[in-house]
């Protein structure tokens, strides 16, 4: 999958989960500090990433610091491809 397709797919997932297009405008937005993503949203995010991109990121190994911005999430998905 092309990087642009991954980026757009991740941003669409984040926009749906957060209910905000801010995630598409500011790729360095801290999703947790802004309250756009919480623990339940995190579980939904990981399930969507696994379903759409085959990313296997167990909740038990999830580190918020590594997944706290759209850019970091996109990078994680690209690494898993």
UniProtKB/Swiss-Prot annotation:
4'-phosphopantetheine is transferred from CoA to a specific serine of apo-DCP. It holds the Pfam family PP-binding. Signal peptide: none annotated. PROSITE patterns: CARRIER (PS50075). One of its GO terms (cellular component) is cytoplasm. It comes from the Bacteria. InterPro entries: ACP-like_sf, DltC, PP-bd_ACP. Its main location: cytoplasm. The modification O-(pantetheine 4'-phosphoryl)serine is found at residue 39. It is found in: Cytoplasm. Keywords: Cell wall biogenesis/degradation, Cytoplasm, Phosphopantetheine, Phosphoprotein. GO terms for biological process: cell wall organization; lipoteichoic acid biosynthetic process. Pathway: Cell wall biogenesis; lipoteichoic acid biosynthesis. One of its GO terms (molecular function) is D-alanyl carrier activity. The keyword Cell wall biogenesis/degradation applies. Belongs to the DltC family. This is D-alanyl carrier protein. The gene is dltC.
């Amino acid at each position: 999958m092309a990087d642009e397709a991954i980026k757009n797919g991740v941003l669409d997932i984040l926009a749906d989960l957060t209910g905000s297009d801010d995630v598409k405008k500011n790729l360095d937005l801290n999703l947790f500090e802004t309250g756009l993503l919480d623990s339940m949203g995190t579980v939904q995010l990981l399930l969507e990433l696994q379903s759409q991109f085959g990313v296997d990121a167990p909740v038990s190994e999830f580190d918020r610091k590594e997944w706290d911005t759209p850019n970091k999430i996109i990078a994680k998905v690209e690494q898993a491809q």
